[in-house]
Swiss-Prot record:
A single BP term in Gene Ontology: virion attachment to host cell
Glycosylation site positions: N30, N46, N141, N167, N249, N424, N496
Location relative to the cell: Virion membrane; Host apical cell membrane
Record's protein name: Hemagglutinin
Predominant location category: virion
SUPFAM superfamilies, per database record: Influenza hemagglutinin (stalk), Viral protein domain
Note: Major glycoprotein, comprises over 80% of the envelope proteins present in virus particle.
Species: Influenza A virus (strain A/Fowl plague virus/Rostock/8/1934 H7N1)
């Protein structure tokens, strides 16, 4: 008996995974959070602190002519109390005032003291010239036990004018001084307020006393006020020191009939300097340009949170203790599961999903997989483009803050010279402005950095897409599935922007036609395989039943049913 058995095999052809190249960016496991204009706590790969919080607890004076006044108060360098004898003339880049310093010996005060102090701090030192005043009919040697050298004395730069004898009349006198130099002169004089009317009569004679001072820009009359006051340094009297700035070729005239403390020499400022009030140690072995009462700030950061009264070339004081400046792209950490599973083609993901922590030599880069294996490489062109734009960001921020805040400084310095001091609440208000501006500037720069990083990523994506054209297809995750065999040299040409599209066009088109009609996602492959197996089994069963039916019909096979 001839029995023919036909066997059919159903072969389901599933296309193998194509070569693939993915675009990605650098990521770290733990980034740094910064604030932008639109969002707080944005995580970035890198960030730099812009607020300095540490300093050197010393006055760094290396390379500077430093004058440490010690017990001498700065204003005393003009009038000359005993504690200031060695500082009557000096040159300095840095003037240090100490808490123990005293401006006076005989009790009194300087009018518009703070404004005068500001002028002297920036003076660069003091040079002096005799005013040439001579007197007759009076005494010029008044002394006091409050100003002691070897015995009773007086201010070295002033003359205490007294009646020729006790209770004698003081003559009306007029003295003038013309500034013949090219620089402005600082002129200081005093008005003596006796401890009582009796004391005033003893020193200057009876009658009302009047002192008049005038120049082309200044005119003022003074009347002494004798009276009982608490004793200081054994004295109940007071001396009020007044001052003016005398322009070149201008003349100052003094008219008086007693109670006048006459200047002996005019003072001239030598240049520019910086003055600070501090009690910390001076160190000639370190350098600095920014000083405050607690030491030296040597930071190159744009802001500081150490002291609002720092002087010199300083970071601007802000209330915030930290303002982080983004110097890297937005961070999207790579999930640990993907790091563990990577190695199969399907595990490679592009920039749309997550960053790559393995990309350590660049900000942007590629991953590929082909028959030769897997590889990762940075794209230096896009990385360098981003770095070039971000490098110097800190310096640009310093320029912005210095320009803006120095302008405010200059405006208020002028006001300070006019009114004698700067109101504390005004300084506090300006600190608020600085703090707000600093936070705004940093947020703007952070926004720009993140936008810039995204822009460079998009540029790289467009560069690859334009090269591959229809030779590949983007899968929606930042990866391109290539429709032709692409070895390592081929992958390198894509990265280097030298890929020849036409060279692979024909192969890519043929593979695309085969793949497109049955393009299946990996999630459905198991279902199709089981369906194919079931269909094959059903077909074989149908053939077997058909053969049995034909054999029975032709008599070649007999079927007997027993009950």
């Amino acid at each position: 008996m001839n029995t023919q058995i036909l066997v059919f095999a159903l072969v389901a052809v599933i296309p193998t995974n194509a070569d693939k190249i993915c675009l990605g960016h650098h990521a770290v496991s733990n980034g740094t959070k910064v604030n932008t204009l639109t969002e707080r706590g944005v995580e970035v790969v890198n960030a730099t602190e812009t607020v300095e919080r540490t300093n050197i607890p010393k006055i760094c004076s290396k390379g500077k002519r430093t004058t440490d006044l010690g017990q001498c108060g700065l204003l005393g360098t003009i009038t000359g109390p005993p504690q200031c004898d060695q500082f009557l003339e000096f040159s300095a880049d840095l003037i240090i005032e100490r808490r123990e310093g005293n401006d006076v010996c005989y009790p009194g005060k300087f009018v518009n003291e703070e404004a005068l102090r500001q002028i002297l701090r920036g003076s660069g030192g003091i040079d002096k010239e005799t005013m040439g005043f001579t007197y007759s009919g009076i005494r010029t040697n008044g002394t006091t036990s409050a100003c002691r050298r070897s015995g009773s004395s007086f201010y070295a730069e002033m003359e205490w004018l007294l009646s020729n004898t006790d209770n004698a009349s003081f003559p009306q006198m007029t003295k003038s001084y013309k500034n013949t130099r090219r620089e402005s002169a600082l002129i200081v004089w005093g008005i003596h307020h006796s401890g009582s009317t009796t004391e005033q009569t003893k020193l200057y004679g009876s009658g009302n006393k009047l002192i008049t001072v005038g120049s082309s820009k200044y005119h003022q009359s003074f009347v002494p006020s004798p009276g009982t006051r608490p004793q200081i340094n054994g004295q109940s009297g007071r001396i009020d020191f007044h001052w003016l700035i005398l322009d070149p070729n201008d003349t100052v005239t003094f008219s008086f009939n007693g109670a006048f403390i006459a200047p002996n020499r005019a003072s001239f400022l030598r240049g520019k300097s910086m003055g600070i009030q501090s009690d910390v140690q001076v160190d000639a072995n370190c350098e600095g340009e920014c000083y405050h009462s607690g030491g030296t700030i040597t930071s190159r950061l744009p802001f500081q949170n150490i002291n609002s009264r720092a002087v010199g070339k300083c970071p601007r004081y802000v209330k915030q203790e930290s303002l982080l400046l983004a110097t890297g792209m937005k961070n999207v950490p790579e999930p640990s599961k993907k790091r563990e599973k990577r190695g199969l083609f399907g595990a490679i993901a592009g920039f749309i999903e997550n960053g790559w922590e393995g990309l350590v030599d660049g900000w942007y880069g590629f991953r590929h997989q082909n028959a030769q294996g897997e590889g990762t490489a940075a794209d230096y062109k896009s990385t360098q483009s981003a770095i070039d734009q971000i490098t110097g960001k800190l310096n640009r921020l310093i320029e912005k803050t210095n320009q803006q805040f120095e302008l405010i400084d200059n405006e208020f310095t002028e006001v300070e010279k006019q009114i004698g001091n700067l109101i504390n609440w005004t300084k506090d208000f300006i600190t608020e402005v600085w703090s707000y501006n600093a936070e705004l500037l940093v947020a703007m720069e952070n926004q720009h950095t993140i936008d810039l990083a995204d822009s460079e990523m998009n540029k790289l994506y467009e560069r690859v897409r334009k090269q591959l054209r229809e030779n590949a297809e983007e899968d929606g995750t930042g990866c391109f599935e290539i429709f032709h065999k692409c070895d390592d040299d081929c992958m390198a040409s894509i990265r280097n922007n030298t890929y020849d599209h036409s060279k692979y066009r024909e192969e890519a088109m043929q593979n695309r036609i085969q793949i497109d009609p049955v393009k299946l996602s990996s999630g459905y492959k198991d279902v199709i395989l089981w369906f194919s197996f079931g269909a094959s089994c059903f077909l074989l069963l149908a053939i077997a039943v058909g053969l049995v039916f034909i054999c029975v019909k032709n008599g070649n096979m007999r079927c007997t049913i027993c009950i």
